[in-house]
């Protein structure tokens, strides 16, 4: 439900991989569109050093350049470090109206923001979906007032129904990939019912049929199947 790496689209999965969240091939374009709308003229980019980070960074870089936005530098960062002042120094030396942080809010991405604020290098952050969460707001508060980002979501009829069901169950439906997780679980159950089996081969055989039947959907990704 939260696997968005573009590389997974062409994965040799033997028919066993499905996802209810859109690929970062689209997410990166949307984030670039928002960057343009916010009048950013130049941006430095840092990404978590894995397939998710590299894939999204590549798409975002190409998309912002297509909008005429200057990319001053693109660097990877490793998660789990205690200090990110070196990475921020590299980003700062390249300059930019903002720094795009493609990573995780509880890992290196948060460290990049902290080091940027501590040094005064940047005060505007472009945030990938993995950086969106209440804990980031709790950590930095008003220091994020110039920042922006994007994450997959839905405003369709199914999303409204899910929000009511989730609220009744004490679940915050606005959380990242909550709706997509529900979709994924529901599709697995429906595929099991359709094949009258919990065998993985049977589930894989039936999951697209039940998805395309539009029996249940809450997310944009699932909407597109119908």
Predicted feature locations:
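Extracytosolic ligand-binding ectodomains
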Residues: 1-219, 226
């Amino acid at each position: 439900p939260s696997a968005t790496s573009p590389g997974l689209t062409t994965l040799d999965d033997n028919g066993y991989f499905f996802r209810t969240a859109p690929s970062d091939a689209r997410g990166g374009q949307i984030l670039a569109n928002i960057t343009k709308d916010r009048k950013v003229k130049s941006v430095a980019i840092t990404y978590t050093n894995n397939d998710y980070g590299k894939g999204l960074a590549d798409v975002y870089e190409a998309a912002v350049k297509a909008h005429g936005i200057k990319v001053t530098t693109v660097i990877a960062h490793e998660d789990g470090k205690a200090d990110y002042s070196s990475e921020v120094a590299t980003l700062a030396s390249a300059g930019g109206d903002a720094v795009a942080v493609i990573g995780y809010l509880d890992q290196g991405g948060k460290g990049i923001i902290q080091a940027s604020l501590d040094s005064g290098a940047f005060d505007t952050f472009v945030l990938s979906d993995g950086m969106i969460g209440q804990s980031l707001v709790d950590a930095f508060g008003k220091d994020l007032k110039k920042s922006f980002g994007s994450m997959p979501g839905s405003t369709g009829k199914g999303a409204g129904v899910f929000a009511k069901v989730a609220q009744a169950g004490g679940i915050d439906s606005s959380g990242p990939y909550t709706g997509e997780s529900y979709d994924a679980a529901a599709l697995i159950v429906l595929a099991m019912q359709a094949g009258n089996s919990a065998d993985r081969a049977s589930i894989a055989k039936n999951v697209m049929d039940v998805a395309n039947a539009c029996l249940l959907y809450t997310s944009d990704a699932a909407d597109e199947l119908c």
